[in-house]
């Protein structure tokens, strides 16, 4: 038997999270001492994110179809409680952001102009975009990574093929296993990818631009941390009636860390799928809930929309009553659920929230420009919260139905 190379033995015996942390440290050191090399290392990050984005649409399509074809009559899918948790978590995130904005008001130094970008005209347009995403061409949905369209076609084909021959079902199941194997291989490259992402980001932008918006960033990221470590654990405890923190910390470590650096919920779908498998969750549940969560579970986006809109209000010296604040929370929740259907995501939905207070589009777009300036941290933290919560709520809903899964909550941290 061929003896394994010592370096490969070290890599295989070290957890993926530990390898990612090593990649993070090397990325920072590379940016500090060899900025030109750091910019070149950005290729590793781009390749990693590109590979994840390339495989994610096919993974979702095949897994969802295979899960529905293999679904047995009378078997629970837990989708209703998961959807409830997604909406509840997003609304509470918006409400926390409103309270934080009242307690710690932020003032913006509005910039002169913003990029040539077109925000949605209203809540109707956001919902209309989502509906049209459902009825899109399946090939176009796969090419554009339109997960609403992919889900719609995968569910439709899955239901239509429930009574197909066993050989057809076996072929689709084998195909899903094949795609999953490719995904696992891509995820093993995460340390190199994150090294490249961190090194190039620090070398090209640095953090100088962030210091002028330190207060705003503290409020934004403080809200996200409060949701991650206080509100979400309370929601999980309500579902499973056990100490929620082992599960919360596992999701943040296994999913949140990768999402923070890739800054893409779609790219993190394969990572979340792998974590769900480690937690031994039912595949027919997480195959649907994870890509759906990447589309509509947007607690981080709700915080971004609310905090930046309230910052604009405070900057202009406007008074906000309780009823308007509650309405802002509702609008932010609905808008956040449609953030994935808007080019530019949560930042371009800020003008929609600002319109509640009669703030003109010119000023609102300047607030959007501020969002782009702080995006290095804001977008990373937002994605980490959004994506890790997808797994957290899926696991909580499944564990509430099947208590035997509770023991699996700490497995990934031991096995990784």
UniProtKB/Swiss-Prot annotation:
GO biological process: one example: threonine transport
Claim: Membrane is one of the keywords in the record: yes
Highest taxon above the source species: Bacteria
Gene Ontology MF terms: neutral L-amino acid:sodium symporter activity
Keywords for this protein: Amino-acid transport, Cell inner membrane, Cell membrane, Membrane, Symport, Transmembrane, Transmembrane helix, Transport
Annotated transmembrane regions: 15-35, 49-69, 82-102, 141-161, 192-212, 217-237, 288-308, 330-350, 356-376
GO CC term, one of those recorded: plasma membrane
Keyword Cell inner membrane appears in the UniProt entry: yes
Subcellular location: Cell inner membrane
InterPro entries cross-referenced by the UniProt entry: Na-dicarboxylate_symporter, Na:dicarbo_symporter_sf, Ser_Thr_transp_SstT
Catalytic activity: L-serine(in) + Na(+)(in) = L-serine(out) + Na(+)(out); L-threonine(in) + Na(+)(in) = L-threonine(out) + Na(+)(out)
Principal place of residence: membrane
Topology of this chain in the membrane: Multi-pass membrane protein
Function, as annotated: Involved in the import of serine and threonine into the cell, with the concomitant import of sodium (symport system).
Family per record: Belongs to the dicarboxylate/amino acid:cation symporter (DAACS) (TC 2.A.23) family.
Protein name as annotated: Serine/threonine transporter SstT
Organism: Aeromonas salmonicida (strain A449)
């Amino acid at each position: 038997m061929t003896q394994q190379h010592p370096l490969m033995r070290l890599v295989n015996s070290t957890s993926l999270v530990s390898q990612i942390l090593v990649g993070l440290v090397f990325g920072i050191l590379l940016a500090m001492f060899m900025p030109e090399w750091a910019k070149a290392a950005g290729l590793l990050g781009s390749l990693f994110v590109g590979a994840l984005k390339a495989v994610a649409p096919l993974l979702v399509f095949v897994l969802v179809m295979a899960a529905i074809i293999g679904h047995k009559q009378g078997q629970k899918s837990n989708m209703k409680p998961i959807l409830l948790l997604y909406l509840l978590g997003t609304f509470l995130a918006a409400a926390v952001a409103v309270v934080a904005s009242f307690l710690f008001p932020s003032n913006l130094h509005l910039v002169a102009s913003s990029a040539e970008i077109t925000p949605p005209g209203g809540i109707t347009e956001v919902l209309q975009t989502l509906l049209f995403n459902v009825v899109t061409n399946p090939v176009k949905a796969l090419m554009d990574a339109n997960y609403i369209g992919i889900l719609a076609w995968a569910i439709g084909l899955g239901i239509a093929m429930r009574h197909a021959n066993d050989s057809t079902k076996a072929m689709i199941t084998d195909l899903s296993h094949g795609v999953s194997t490719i995904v696992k291989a891509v995820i093993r490259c995460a340390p190199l990818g994150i090294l490249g992402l961190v090194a190039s980001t620090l070398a090209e932008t640095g953090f100088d631009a962030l210091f002028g918006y330190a207060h705003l960033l503290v409020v934004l990221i403080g809200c996200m941390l409060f949701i991650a470590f206080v509100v979400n654990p309370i929601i999980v405890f309500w579902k499973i009636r056990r100490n929620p923190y082992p599960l919360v910390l596992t999701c943040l470590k296994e999913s949140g860390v990768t999402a923070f650096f890739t800054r893409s919920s779609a790219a993190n779908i394969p990572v979340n799928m792998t974590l769900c498998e480690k937690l031994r969750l039912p595949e027919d549940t997480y195959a649907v809930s994870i890509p759906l969560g990447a589309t509509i579970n947007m607690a981080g986006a709700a915080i971004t929309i609310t905090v930046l809109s309230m910052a604009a209000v405070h900057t202009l010296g406007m008074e906000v009553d309780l009823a308007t604040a509650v309405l802002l929370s509702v609008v932010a929740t609905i808008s956040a659920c449609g953030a994935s259907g808007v080019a530019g995501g949560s930042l371009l939905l800020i003008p929609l929230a600002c319109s509640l207070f009669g703030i003109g589009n010119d000023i609102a777009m300047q607030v959007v420009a501020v969002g782009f300036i702080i995006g290095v941290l804001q977008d990373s933290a937002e994605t980490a919260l959004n994506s890790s919560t997808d797994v957290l709520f899926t696991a909580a809903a499944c564990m509430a139905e099947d208590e035997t899964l509770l023991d699996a909550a700490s497995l990934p941290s031991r096995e990784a």
